[in-house]
């Protein structure tokens, strides 16, 4: 992480009293951050650390300091999610052979597991930032390598979308989440203030943004966080832009943003932990069902097309990750095959859904995300997912689970979707839910919702 550390050192020298971190009620200047990193380096130097050191801490401030201190010691941080169940922690430590784990109270060393990631293996991945994990929504989280060059390339294109002289970046999610860690390093490398929270609390976050009068804030959030913020937002705050990632932002939320804060820029990113950014949509200028236009440094193709021309999305860019741990290294010249299906039309990317969410109804492939986006254009529906349940005649049938203040009939839904989708894409059943349940990364937990529905718990 040579470049980012050099940039951080430059900011420490040129503006030592500027705020680097504003976490909850604590503010830390660039000078103070440098001193605390130096102190952490001195403490960690007492130990014989292995090449990879896991960080599993609840405190964002301590996590940031440890992350940067490990880089000064030429170690590779592995970012673990503190909210994972202890069994998941144990499984990951055993699977990847992690010997050193920094927790909230101590450094645990010589964990009884065979060394898996060693210095020889890391030589194939120069200039690593960290080892991160996928969200693990369909199984055990999967470890991957992220290098510095890829995020420096992301910072460059991201800067093009900072259109309002934003001098602070807020990201209230856990640092183990790629979006939050990205926002932190983007802020520190560019000399801005990073605003974060131990636990997301919308009203307190807005108060943090208001506390320093000079803040012009860009917020990096998932859609569910934006929805929560709008419930307590007023025009006193200094938010200049929302950068939304992790899921498609419902058009109803965009309308609320423009009704409550017409001057705020809304930039939707589509990408993954592995690919970083793929496309963007500024102020919903793209067609409603699209996830925007490709970033200029992204190449995209689709393969394995069905009869509708929908295929598997493959991406190539200099923002790509370096590969999964224990698998082959990936370079910028290789195509990465995502788990997403979609198509490109007139320069806009359309995402039809994740491969494992696809339903097969009467022999027809159904992509729920496409229908869900249409449904959320209805003023009667806040959020919607379509799940598949077994059916003797058709193999599966689609069931719409939706939230909103209005109770709909199947006839209402059918009339709304008529002429918008094919007949077999219309859900066979509908069910109103009081609320949706979400994953740790803020996405609707499809598997949990389906399990609860099948058990009669919704």
From Swiss-Prot:
UniProt record, GO biological process: fatty acid metabolic process
Which Gene3D superfamilies does the entry mention?
3.30.300.30, N-terminal domain of ligase-like
Q: Which organism is it from?
A: Staphylococcus aureus (strain MRSA252)
Q: What is this protein called?
A: Putative long chain fatty acid-CoA ligase VraA
Xref: InterPro entries? AMP-bd_C (IPR025110), AMP-bd_C_sf (IPR045851), AMP-binding_CS (IPR020845), AMP-dep_synth/lig_dom (IPR000873), ANL_N_sf (IPR042099)
Which EC number(s) are documented for this chain?
Answer: 6.2.1.-
Listed CDD domains:
AFD_YhfT-like
Q: Name one GO molecular function term.
A: medium-chain fatty acid-CoA ligase activity
Listed as disulfide-bonded, the cysteine pairs are none
Keywords attached to this Swiss-Prot or TrEMBL record, sorted alphabetically, are: Fatty acid metabolism, Ligase, Lipid metabolism
Q: Name one Pfam family in it.
A: AMP-binding_C
């Amino acid at each position: 992480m040579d470049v980012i550390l050099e940039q951080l050192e430059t900011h420490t020298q040129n503006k030592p009293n500027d705020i680097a971190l504003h976490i909850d009620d604590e503010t830390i200047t660039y000078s103070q951050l440098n001193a605390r990193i130096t102190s952490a380096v001195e403490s960690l130097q007492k130990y014989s650390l292995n090449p990879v050191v896991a960080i599993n801490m609840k405190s964002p401030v301590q996590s940031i300091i440890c992350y940067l201190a490990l880089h000064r010691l030429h170690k590779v941080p592995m970012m673990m999610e503190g909210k994972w169940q202890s069994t998941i922690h144990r499984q990951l430590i055993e699977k990847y052979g992690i010997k050193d784990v920094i927790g909230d109270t101590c450094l645990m060393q010589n964990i009884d597991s065979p060394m898996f990631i060693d210095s020889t293996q890391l030589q194939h991945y120069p200039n690593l930032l960290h080892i991160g994990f996928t969200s693990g929504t369909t199984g055990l989280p999967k470890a991957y390598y992220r290098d510095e060059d890829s995020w420096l390339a992301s910072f460059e294109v991201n800067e093009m979308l900072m259109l309002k002289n934003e001098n602070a970046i807020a990201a209230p999610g856990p640092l183990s989440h790629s979006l939050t860690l990205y926002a932190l390093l983007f802020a520190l490398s560019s000399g801005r203030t990073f605003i974060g929270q131990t636990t997301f609390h919308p009203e307190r976050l807005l108060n943090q943004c208001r506390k320093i009068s000079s803040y012009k804030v860009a917020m990096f959030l998932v859609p569910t966080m934006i929805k929560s913020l709008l419930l307590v937002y007023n025009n006193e705050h200094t938010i200049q832009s929302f950068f939304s990632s992790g899921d498609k932002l419902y058009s109803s939320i965009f309308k609320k943003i423009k009704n409550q804060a017409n001057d705020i820029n809304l930039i939707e990113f589509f990408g993954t932990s592995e690919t970083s950014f793929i496309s963007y949509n500024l102020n919903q200028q793209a067609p409603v069902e699209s996830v925007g236009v490709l970033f200029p440094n992204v190449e995209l193709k689709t393969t394995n097309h069905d009869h509708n021309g929908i295929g598997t999305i493959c991406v190539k860019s200099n923002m790509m990750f370096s590969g999964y741990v224990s698998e082959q290294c990936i370079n910028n010249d290789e195509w990465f095959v995502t788990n997403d299906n979609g198509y490109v039309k007139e320069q806009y990317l359309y995402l039809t859904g994740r491969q494992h969410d696809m339903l097969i109804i009467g022999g027809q492939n159904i992509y729920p995300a496409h229908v869900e986006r249409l449904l959320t254009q209805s003023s009667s529906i806040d959020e919607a997912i379509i799940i598949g349940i077994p059916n003797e005649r058709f193999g599966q049938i689609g069931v719409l689970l939706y939230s909103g203040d209005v109770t709909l009939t199947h006839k209402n839904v059918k009339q709304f979707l008529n002429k918008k989708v094919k007949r077999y894409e219309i859900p066979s059943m509908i069910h109103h839910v009081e609320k949706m349940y979400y994953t740790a990364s803020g996405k609707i937990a499809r598997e949990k919702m389906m399990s609860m529905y099948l058990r009669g718990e919704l």
